[in-house]
Design a protein with these regions (language model features):
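N-terminal glycine-rich phosphate-binding loop and ensuing alpha1 helix
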Residues: 1-61
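Phosphate- and divalent-cation-binding pockets in alpha/beta enzyme and binding domains
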Residues: 13, 36, 59-62, 86-90, ...
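Conserved beta-loop-beta/alpha segment of the NTase-like Rossmann-fold superfamily
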Residues: 60-61, 68-147
Length: 236
């Protein structure tokens, strides 16, 4: 399986807390969080790992180059984009088959992710398999609406959950090159990853199906970082 890591953000909340390194380099267990994620992806059978890395982060670019020189299948794509969807589009450009995309701060159980990789590989070509979770810790989660037939039919950013259930995006996206091509082919221009997910579910013929994780969250501040180390310690 190919993986795409989005590492374009500086991490404004970490900056406010006094961190001097860019967000992907914030440590988990004394290692950059993006390195911890890459180790997990290797454990889950990575064929190729594409990293959309902010071109203004030399510390990150140097670190990724070190990993590549050590033989890891990392392809660095230096980017400067307007929003998170544009980062996804640039980082995944040229991938024809299936891939799983995520941000550099994604935290999830490794065993469940292995099952997710298998499910994405086996999903029909016209189906996007999106990670969801009932573990809601984010201040402004992206709520998902799942129909009675089990299909994701809408998303809502912040506010109240849909009436059907409280379930949110896990920040894990099972996609393909052909699915990525549907959005621009319809003349749609998502303003963010959240907008991309909603447009994919509401405005395109792509079938969007859920894959549920017991726990999944992003690392946006020191509190999240400590939680991530606690959870990863248990899962490992």
């Amino acid at each position: 399986m190919d993986f795409v890591i989005l590492a374009g953000g500086l991490g404004s909340r970490f900056v406010k807390e006094g961190y001097e390194c860019p967000k992907p380099m914030v440590p988990l267990f004394w290692r950059p969080m993006i390195g911890v994620l890459i180790d997990t992806l290797m454990e889950c059978g990575a064929d190729r790992i594409y990293v959309g890395a902010n071109a203004r982060m030399p510390m990150l670019l140097d670190y990724l180059e070190e990993l590549r020189e050590k033989g890891l299948p990392v392809e660095v794509r230096p980017i400067i984009t307007d929003n998170s969807y544009c980062t996804l589009k640039a980082a995944s450009e040229g991938i024809e088959g299936k891939f799983i995309a995520m941000t550099c701060d994604a935290i999830f159980p490794t065993d469940e992710f292995k099952d997710y990789v298998k499910a994405v590989a086996e999903a029909p070509a016209d189906t996007a398999l999106m990670g969801l979770t009932r573990f809601v810790e984010d201040e402004s989660p992206l709520y998902a609406r799942v129909s009675e037939s089990g299909e994701v039919v809408d998303y809502r950013y912040g506010g109240e959950p849909f009436a059907e259930s409280t379930i949110v995006s896990a920040g894990l996206y099972g996609l393909s090159g052909s699915i990525m091509g549907v959005i621009p082919a319809l003349g749609l221009e998502p303003e963010s990853l959240s907008d991309f997910q909603r447009l994919l579910a509401v405005k395109t013929p792509v079938k969007v199906m859920p894959f549920e994780f017991t726990i999944a969250f992003d690392v946006d501040n020191t509190r999240d970082r400590l939680h991530a180390e606690e959870f990863l310690g248990k899962w490992k």
